[in-house]
Amino acid sequence: MNFGNKIKCSICKKKIFLREKNLFFPFCSKKCKIIDLYQWISGKYKLF
């Protein structure tokens, strides 16, 4: 079955499908989503 293009999770670099039913998109899992949220809260990410 063809789900379309693959992208990489920005946290763990696991490949995921663009059209895959994923509640945590653009991350591969809840864990990666929480890690990203923590990085925003802790100030690792900044908007200029």
Swiss-Prot record:
A GO term for molecular function: zinc ion binding
Record Pfam families: YacG
A Gene Ontology BP annotation from the UniProt entry: regulation of DNA-templated transcription
Residues reported in the UniProt entry to bind Zn(2+): 9, 12, 28, 32
Keyword set, alphabetical order: Metal-binding, Zinc
Cofactor annotation remark: Binds 1 zinc ion.
Swiss-Prot/TrEMBL cofactor(s): Zn(2+)
Primary role: Inhibits all the catalytic activities of DNA gyrase by preventing its interaction with DNA. Acts by binding directly to the C-terminal domain of GyrB, which probably disrupts DNA binding by the gyrase.
Quaternary context: Interacts with GyrB.
Similarity field: Belongs to the DNA gyrase inhibitor YacG family.
The protein's name in its UniProt record: DNA gyrase inhibitor YacG
Organism: Wigglesworthia glossinidia brevipalpis
Gene name in the database record: yacG
